[in-house]
A protein has these predicted regions:
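Structured interface patches
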Residues: 1-229
Length: 229
């Protein structure tokens, strides 16, 4: 390596013993290379989704099983321009959950996607130091089924004032549409009993009370209101 010129001389040999080195000519006789420091930095990584699931289903959640950070090593000039690392997942037509590898997408600070040639200069490892072969990350995609017209129920405690009685309780809306894992839906037993308890102790007039359905849904893992609700 000629440090002054930044070139490496080329040498060509011939396996035919009848051909002497003096008879071999080639061009160019050297190649110019650029050397720079190799550095490593940690970056956050997140899964993104595009497309729509099959009718009657909804995306529950998506998670990169390799962790939410990666270590990227490579030429300093290339590492410095990295701005965003994601794993795009196409959920078009999906009706079942899956665990599968997906290509890692790297964007520079101008929002441009790094080319395959640029990515080939990089080494990507998870936070444990395990290399992500072929720049692929393993993603868990959970698809939930939609359940329509799930009736709402509330619990009341206490008694109205003497001389009064409860003629009825009206819930508006009467039902909701839920996206849920099958096991969670079975746990609900076909209805959603709101966690908030309504006290009717000593009341003498009709009352309007507002309850947040999400306060109850948040007690479960794997269920939420339908996205369009």
């Amino acid at each position: 390596y000629n440090e002054y010129l930044g070139t490496v001389p080329l040498e060509v040999t011939c396996s035919n013993s009848h051909v002497g080195q003096e008879n071999i000519r080639f061009t160019p006789s050297s190649i110019k290379i650029t050397m720079e420091d190799k550095v490593e930095e940690s970056f956050g990584i997140a899964a993104t989704t595009n497309g729509k699931t099959e009718k009657g289903y909804e995306l529950g959640n998506v998670k990169i099983l390799n962790g939410d950070t990666v270590k990227v090593a490579g030429p300093q000039s290339l590492i410095r321009i990295i701005s965003k690392i994601t794993v795009p997942v196409d959920i078009t037509g999906m009706s079942e959950s899956s665990v599968a590898p997906y290509p890692i997408r790297i964007e520079d600070k101008n929002g441009a996607v790094l080319s395959d040639i640029q990515k080939d200069k990089l080494e990507i490892k998870d936070n444990s130091g395990i290399f992500l072969q072929d720049h692929m990350a393993t993603v868990s995609t959970n698809i939930w089924k939609l359940y329509n017209d799930i009736p709402l129920e509330v619990k009341c405690v206490g008694n109205p004032a003497p001389g009064y009685r409860i003629s009825g309780i009206t819930i508006t809306p009467k039902s909701v549409n839920l996206a849920a894992e099958e096991a969670v839906y079975e746990e609900l037993e076909g209805k959603l009993v709101l966690n908030d308890t309504i006290s009717i102790e000593g009341i003498t007039t009709s009352e309007d009370i507002t309850l947040d359905v999400n306060d109850t849904l948040n007690l479960y893992s794997g269920v939420r209101l339908e996205a369009d609700t």
